[in-house]
Amino acid sequence: MATRPQSPRARRWGYGISALINLIVAWGVNIWPGWDAVPFLTSGMTQVLPLVNLSLLVGFLTNLAYLVADPPWFKALGNILTAGISIAVLVRTLRVFPFDFGDSASTWDPITRGILIFLIVASTLGLAVQVVQFGRLLIRGPGPIKD
């Protein structure tokens, strides 16, 4: 089933909404209600928060950049950057493990660790795909890629 390419207007709407979501999440995590309002997060979250904020900032800035120009090579480069930072956030979260599930820890700790490991693996695969995509775009030039 062939998909129709999105119009530039639709893509720009998506970039604008994504940038706005990054701002809203950053505000929610840092200002109100703040990460410490989440009952199962521990003070260890302060060790993860700088990378979370970096991820939100880079996501915001890349989406703003895509509003101006979104050629495939530029999108692939932005995706490489955001995926790399996301992996760093996930690895830091797994190492620090800023969660306290109280009486349910014996159930939720391994589930949460498993989800984090799955996300690290999936994000790493996604990063590899973006690196290959970027390389193909550099080799083949700006024309469409035919699989």
Predicted regions and their residues:
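C-terminal halves and exits of single transmembrane alpha-helices
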Residues: T82-S104, A128
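Alpha-helical membrane-associated segments of multi-pass integral membrane proteins
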Residues: D103-R140
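Membrane-water interface at transmembrane helix exits
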Residues: N30, G34, A65, V91, ...
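Membrane-interface helix termini and inter-helical loops of multi-pass transporters
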Residues: W35-T42, F99-W108
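N-terminal signal-anchor transmembrane alpha-helix
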Residues: M1-L57
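Short, charged juxtamembrane terminal tails flanking transmembrane helices
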Residues: M1-T3, R136-D147
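Alpha-helical transmembrane segments of integral membrane proteins
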Residues: T46-L56, G78-I85, T112-S123
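Loop-to-transmembrane helix junctions at the membrane interface
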Residues: G59-R92
